[in-house]
């Protein structure tokens, strides 16, 4: 008598993601650390100098965190109302922030009290940034104005009122001391030169603008609003280069990698998309638990920090590169070669390989099938761990029972719990094309066996109704597909030119002038 052969579990093709260098790079960020803030995290900004601490603006506070700290190393809480846009200066020594009470405040990182308070706006200030010369501050407010402030004298230098709605974002140029851009809910982005009294350029984004970003080169500007991320060429007078629509909800924040080769965008759809700035295609994506309001990447690209609407701060550190240990150069004892002898031996083509017989350990369902316990074998693969994580094993056992002609007997005689587990599996996988042939047979047998007693259990009755709905929905779906297929055949038939059949008799060629 031949020995029992274990049940062969078929493998099905899986649609795996394409592994690229970007995928490997961005997946090297470790499991995130999460910190709960007092309110929604509206702004995250890294210090430009080491050790790259970062400011987190949330509710009425601005917290400063160290690179690896999970508690704030410093807190600025002297705001009368909600704080906005805590931003470091280029040297990392000063920090500016706006507030709901319309005042722009300037803080020294080593102190707590405000060094300067700039009053001039009449409504909340949502955007604050330093110019590249470090001596001026740009601000944008809900009063539709953007202002330029002088830090040493604490006075207003210039005021611009060209927007017709709230100004919620902006940025300054890292190359030009006088150039800055603002984005507004009036759908426009305006570029200003501090030496003039009006804007030098205007672009229409088409949606309320939530974030703007200037490339380090100063030639390109990125705007985010609605579901769109748009790239503009400033050197060509604000010409639109590309419009990206990869998010499902409003895009709220933007940031660049240190090299400028990757652009990151965060959205209310809980995704962070990473784009290549060469072709503006998505090269990677991060998923988060809540809608994203703010996003920042450390200057050395070793940290990604994301702020969400539920007040959670999500921090990911990049894993250090694995370094191969250097081979030891110490002299070894002569007997060492005895222990490592044959380590690098490669077998030749004509060598005879004698394998040691390995005793196969049968799975539980294989043991039951070997003992002809059909119903128990089916019970074994209907356990929650197998039917949810490895449905192909459950289907393989059903196929084996059908091959042996014992499928109907194995399905019969089940109590409410066992029948409920079987129906749950059917409801989940019945419309899967990979499992459809065998599961249709199982469903037919269940209906034949248990339809007379289905009303005795409310749970089973509800599952039978759901099974009917799933089948009806699939039938309607198939009918719609057949209709679409028929329409496509009609379109293709009208587009195809009639070709002469090879067996059709050729028409005679008449001489000129003949009828």
Swiss-Prot record:
The keyword Phosphoprotein does not apply. WD repeats lie at residues 36-75, 78-117, 120-159, 162-202, 204-242, 246-285, 287-326. Gene3D superfamilies: YVTN repeat-like/Quinoprotein amine dehydrogenase (2.130.10.10). GO terms for biological process: positive regulation of transcription by RNA polymerase I; ribosomal small subunit biogenesis; rRNA processing. It is found in: Nucleus, Nucleolus. Keywords: Nucleus, Repeat, rRNA processing, WD repeat. One of its GO terms (cellular component) is nucleolus. Part of the small subunit (SSU) processome, composed of more than 70 proteins and the RNA chaperone small nucleolar RNA (snoRNA) U3. May be a component of the proposed t-UTP subcomplex of the ribosomal small subunit (SSU) processome. Ribosome biogenesis factor. Involved in nucleolar processing of pre-18S ribosomal RNA. Required for optimal pre-ribosomal RNA transcription by RNA polymerase I. Part of the small subunit (SSU) processome, first precursor of the small eukaryotic ribosomal subunit. During the assembly of the SSU processome in the nucleolus, many ribosome biogenesis factors, an RNA chaperone and ribosomal proteins associate with the nascent pre-rRNA and work in concert to generate RNA folding, modifications, rearrangements and cleavage as well as targeted degradation of pre-ribosomal RNA by the RNA exosome. This is U3 small nucleolar RNA-associated protein 15 homolog. The gene is utp15.
């Amino acid at each position: 008598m031949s020995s029992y052969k274990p049940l062969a579990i078929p493998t099905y093709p899986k649609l795996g993601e394409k592994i690229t260098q970007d995928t490997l790079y961005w997946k090297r960020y470790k499991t995130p650390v999460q910190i709960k803030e007092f309110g929604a995290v509206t702004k995250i900004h890294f210090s430009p100098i080491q050790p790259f601490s970062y400011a987190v603006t949330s509710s009425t506070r601005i917290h400063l965190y160290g690179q690896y700290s999970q508690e704030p190393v410093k807190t600025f809480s002297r705001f009368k109302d909600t704080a906005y846009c805590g931003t470091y200066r280029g040297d990392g020594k000063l920090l500016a922030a706006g507030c709901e009470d319309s005042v722009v405040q300037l803080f020294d990182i080593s102190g707590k009290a405000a060094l300067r308070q700039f009053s001039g706006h009449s409504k909340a200030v949502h955007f604050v940034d330093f110019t590249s010369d470090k001596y001026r501050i740009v601000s944008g407010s809900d009063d539709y104005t953007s202002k330029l402030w002088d830090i040493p004298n604490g006075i207003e230098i210039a005021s611009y009122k060209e927007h017709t709605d709230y100004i919620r974002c902006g940025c300054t140029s890292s190359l030009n001391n006088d150039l800055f851009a603002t984005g507004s809910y009036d759908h426009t982005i305006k570029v200003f030169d501090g030496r003039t009294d009006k804007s030098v350029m205007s672009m229409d984004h088409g949606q309320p603008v939530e974030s703007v970003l200037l490339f380090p080169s100063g030639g390109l500007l990125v705007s985010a609003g609605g579901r769109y991320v748009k790239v503009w060429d400033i050197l060509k007078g604000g010409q639109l280069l590309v419009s990206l629509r990869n998010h499902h909800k409003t895009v709220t924040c933007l940031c660049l990698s240190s090299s400028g080769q990757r652009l990151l965008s965060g959205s209310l759809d809980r995704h962070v998309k990473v784009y290549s700035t060469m072709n503006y295609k998505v090269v990677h994506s991060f998923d988060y638990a809540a809608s994203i309001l703010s996003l920042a990447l450390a200057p050395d690209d070793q940290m990604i920090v994301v702020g969400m609407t539920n007040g959670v701060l999500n921090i990911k550190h990049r894993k250090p590169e694995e370094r191969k240990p250097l081979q030891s150069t110490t002299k070894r004892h002569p007997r060492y070669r005895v222990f490592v002898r044959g380590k690098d031996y490669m077998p030749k083509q004509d060598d005879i390989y004698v394998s040691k017989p390995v005793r196969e350990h049968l799975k539980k369902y294989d043991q039951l099938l070997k003992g002809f316990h059909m119903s128990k074998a089916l019970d074994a693969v209907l356990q929650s761990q197998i039917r949810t994580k490895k449905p192909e094993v459950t289907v393989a056992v059903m196929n084996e029972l059908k091959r042996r002609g014992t499928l109907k007997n194995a399905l019969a005689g089940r109590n409410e719990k066992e029948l409920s587990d079987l129906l749950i599996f059917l409801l989940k996988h019945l419309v899967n094309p990979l499992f459809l042939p065998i599961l249709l047979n199982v469903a037919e047998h269940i209906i034949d066996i248990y339809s007379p007693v289905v009303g005795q259990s409310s749970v089973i009755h509800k599952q039978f109704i759901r099974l009917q709905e799933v089948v009806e929905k699939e039938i309607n779906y198939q009918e719609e597909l057949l209709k679409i297929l028929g329409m496509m055949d009609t379109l293709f038939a009208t587009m195809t030119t009639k070709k002469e059949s090879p067996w059709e008799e050729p028409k005679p060629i008449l001489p000129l002038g003949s009828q």
